[in-house]
Amino acid sequence: MLFGISIENRKSAETMASAVTMPSSDGIPSIDGMKKVAITFDDGPNPDYTEMLLAGLKERGVKATFFLLGKEVEKYPDIVADIYAEGHLIGTHSYEHVNLKNLSDTAAIEQVDKTNAAIHEITGEYPEYIRPPFGCWKCNLDYETKMIEVLWDVDPLDWKTSNSDVIAKRVVDKVGENDIILLHDASESSVKAAFKIIDELQREGYTFVTVEEILFD
């Protein structure tokens, strides 16, 4: 869903939704010749693992996209400031990780607005992108929030296993050009898997970009 326009390019997966908001290039090289891929992290900031992740991303020269929970933003503003200072893209993931479709429009908008306000308080910018929990968005909110919904192409279900090798293999085996990878920064195994994914895909010639560059470049 992009500015209220449905793009019928949704891919099925084991989770409630597994799709991206823009069509895939199906392996066709981009105009600038780069093989692009975006790595994204949900549910942060996490006091134990986000800084570890940021250090590894910086070491590898990678820019990522973080979809943050408002309640965690309020608890760990310094980590949010670090994410922003490192040049990563920050999006909204709701305030309390609730299924927005189960809420009234007013309550759903509050989940978004409270998170956006918390992020703005730290970064001075309001997020433009939202990844709704479970991939469940209320389409009529497109006109209320003016945010761009971003889902995903590859979901290794990293929250179901503590084996970083398994997580990494699930991604590397499936990922393609212009795909958006879904991970979380709430466990050591997910962070280690992210590093393994990045290292392997960089060896394969991929360049990591933010979701904004996937959607609009």
Where are the predicted features?
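Residues marking helix boundaries in flexible regions
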Residues: 6-8, 199
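Hydrophobic membrane-insertion alpha-helices, especially the h-region
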Residues: 1-5
